[in-house]
């Protein structure tokens, strides 16, 4: 049998990435999301919901809360309350959390890649093979800097709370680019995702 014949007769198994797992996750949340503030989801107000769509098909993925001014103020206040304790963990303590976050990204990378592709419209291959490994890598990298902060950056102090706006083109990767260094150095983050890629 030639190589060409082998390729022509190969039986392909199912891809390890499946939309079914992402759909179950969205259904468990009734495809509705409030704001995540202070470690908790806010109540959902139907008047402030907007629709997140799959740009490839126009399909509704979920309905999301558009934050009100009072919710933004609550998020900033929660971040300010949390920041002193986060800073007090020290670089090694913060690094443990960032390493754990990187490992969670790796553990759930297939699900996150499917969600990122559905939300953004980019090919799954790009999310899975490009974005997700870099997301984990950024958290690993900045965890290392957190461990070195005391000796390599003596006298540096956190600024407090960082407000970060994430664009639509690399939502999860941009989150890692912006949040990982801020968190590593002892800051807290209030994040505003793009309305087109909010999941």
Question: What are the residue ranges of the model-derived segments?
Answer:
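Conserved small-residue-rich beta-alpha loop and adjacent elements
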Residues: 144, 148-199
């Amino acid at each position: 049998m030639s190589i060409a014949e082998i390729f022509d007769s190969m039986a392909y198994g199912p891809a390890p990435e499946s939309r079914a797992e992402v759909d179950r996750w969205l259904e468990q949340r009734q495809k509705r999301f409030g704001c995540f503030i202070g470690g908790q989801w806010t109540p959902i107000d139907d008047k402030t919901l907007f629709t997140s769509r799959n740009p490839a098909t126009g399909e509704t993925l979920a309905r999301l809360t558009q934050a009100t001014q009072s919710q933004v103020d609550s998020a900033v206040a929660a971040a300010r309350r949390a920041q002193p304790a986060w800073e007090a963990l020290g670089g090694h303590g913060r690094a443990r959390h960032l390493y754990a976050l990187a490992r969670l990204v790796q553990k759930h990378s297939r699900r996150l890649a499917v969600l990122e592709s559905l939300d953004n419209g980019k090919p799954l291959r790009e999310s899975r093979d490009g974005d997700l490994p870099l997301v984990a890598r950024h958290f690993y990298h900045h965890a290392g800097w957190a461990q070195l902060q005391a000796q390599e950056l003596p006298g540096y102090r956190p600024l407090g709370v960082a407000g970060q706006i994430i664009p639509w083109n690399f939502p999860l990767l941009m989150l890692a680019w912006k949040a990982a260094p801020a968190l590593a150095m002892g800051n807290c983050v209030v994040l505003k995702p793009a309305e087109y890629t909010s999941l």
